[in-house]
Amino acid sequence: MAHSQFDLLRQRRFLPYFTVQAFGAFNDNVFRQAIIGLLGAMVAAGTMDPALRGTYAQLAPAVFILPYFLFSSIAGQFAERTEKSKLIRITTAMEIAIMSLAAVGFLLQDMRVLLVALFATGVQSTLFGPVKYSILPSVLKPEELTGGNGLVEMGTSIAVLLGMLFGGLIFAVAGEHGTQAAAVAVILLAICGNLVSRAIPRVDASAPELKIQWNPIPESLAILRLAKKQLAVRNSVLGVSWFWFTGTMLTGNLPVYAETHLGGTQTLYVFALAIFSIGVGAGSLLCEK
């Protein structure tokens, strides 16, 4: 019997999980873009050297991505060992604590605190990543997996881009109260994600007796060897990694590029992200066809 992938959005086995991962992606990017907005506000106020703005804008994505390289193999083991809905609740609780630290950084306008919080956000996202994908085969039927994955990618990508828009507009809309608005926004979004995570049904751990290997190097090498042996896995890893690498680098530099090289305003930046969002959403939905 034919079914629509959107039918999954009416089911408790999928909707809370879908909402949580979208909240997480949205908040991460609100936070990152609010940092860029703060940099612009500090330059305008004369409290930061304009040359440092570009440096921090380049540094922020690297700080966020670094934990993926360091801890992905360990995070994957936790996803195998821990009951999945419990692990999601743990990661969303971590997000509340991390965003509380970020709020302090915004209020103090202290980039050191914000970069520490950004690194911690990367750690939290690294821990959430494996369970985000490994939970789907446990809650979806085989014929629902392609459509379900498409919805997740659509939700994630659009949440990322909308988060960038929202975060970028915080200081433009709130003006001199931008730091307070950013602090409140990231904490409230983290709390919302944690509350929704409590509705995710229990999903048993895949390997509850697994012994965690804390050295990430041997585990990472073993994963790479496994991916090398399986062509489909290798190509999937390379494709997804390249998409997020190029997307993160391009969108992270888009605000400065639009202003400095194109002579545009915030409107041009918003328009470019909106076009990209439409393309990502359309592609994700078409993957089931």
Positions of predicted regions on the chain:
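Juxtamembrane intracellular "pre-TM" segments in multi-pass secondary transporters
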Residues: 1-15, 203-238, 261
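Helix-to-coil boundary motifs at intracellular loop junctions of multi-pass secondary transporters
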Residues: 38, 42-43, 81, 135-139, ...
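Helix-loop junctions on the cytosolic side of multi-pass membrane transporters
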Residues: 134, 138-139, 143, 178, ...
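Substrate-agnostic recognition of the 12-TM MFS/MFS-like secondary transporter fold
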Residues: 15-33, 60-98, 113-172, 190, ...
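Transmembrane alpha-helix termini and helix-breaking/packing motifs in multi-pass membrane transporters
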Residues: 34-47, 102-108, 162-186, 260-261
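Loop-to-transmembrane helix entry
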Residues: 46-65, 259-277
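A helix-boundary/kink motif common to multi-pass secondary transporters
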Residues: 44, 53, 83-84, 110, ...
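Helix-loop junctions at the membrane-solvent interface of multi-pass transporters
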Residues: 98-109, 173-174, 195-203
